[in-house]
Amino acid sequence: MEISTNPPSSSSSSVSSSIINGSLHHHIITRSDHYPTTFVQADSSSFKQVVQMLTGSSSPRSPDSPRPPTTPSGKGNFVIPPIKTAQPKKHSGNKLYERRSHGGFNNNLKNSLMINTLMIGGGGAGSPRFSPRNQEILSPSCLDFPKLALNSPVTPLKQGTNGNEGDPFDKMSPLSEEERGIADKGYYLHRSPISTPRDSEPQLLPLFPVTSPRLSPEM
């Protein structure tokens, strides 16, 4: 088996190296071209050893020896950054001031509502029932419920011309009769006003002429 390599050279001579049974022999061969060729003779059993000697490997590597770790190209100098520990957030002074201001507003609102309730009940700052120490405690005795009660307005019932037409609780009123008619029959007919007296016979209007125009006395 032969392996030939052609390294570039400017000289016209070439160096031929041959390895036979582990010994290296050099032969100088003059050639007309400028590319010397290295010929290597080896059998199939020693071919691997010869290739390792030519490539620079000092000793063949055993199959059980661990392989060196391979690093991908461009990532050999990659360093894992340290994990940043989460630090507790510090509340700014503005947010703390806002919470304090809102808390003071709520307390002032609560105190003002309490004082107003006591004043409505009939007791002010000079009342014996008013005590600055017991502002947080409100008992029913401190409040005057009759004075706090609001009178609901009374809505008058709408009445008709007869005085009892608009009372829905009166069984004889037209409203109750209308409701009963709708509940029984599903409809209710209102009576139409009559302009003429009921005793007189209604007047009939002729729809067609009674006499013929040919029999008129003018002709």
Curated annotation (Swiss-Prot):
Region of interest (Disordered), residue spans: 52-94, 156-177, 190-219
Keywords assigned: Nucleus, Phosphoprotein
Modified residue annotations for Phosphothreonine: 155, 196, 211
Motif (VQ): 47-56
Major site of localization recorded for this protein: nucleus
Localisation: Nucleus
InterPro entries: VQ (IPR008889), VQ_4/11/13/19/31/33 (IPR039611)
Protein function: May modulate WRKY transcription factor activities.
Protein name as catalogued: VQ motif-containing protein 19
Organism placement in taxonomy: Eukaryota, Viridiplantae, Streptophyta, Embryophyta, Tracheophyta
Gene from which the chain derives: VQ19
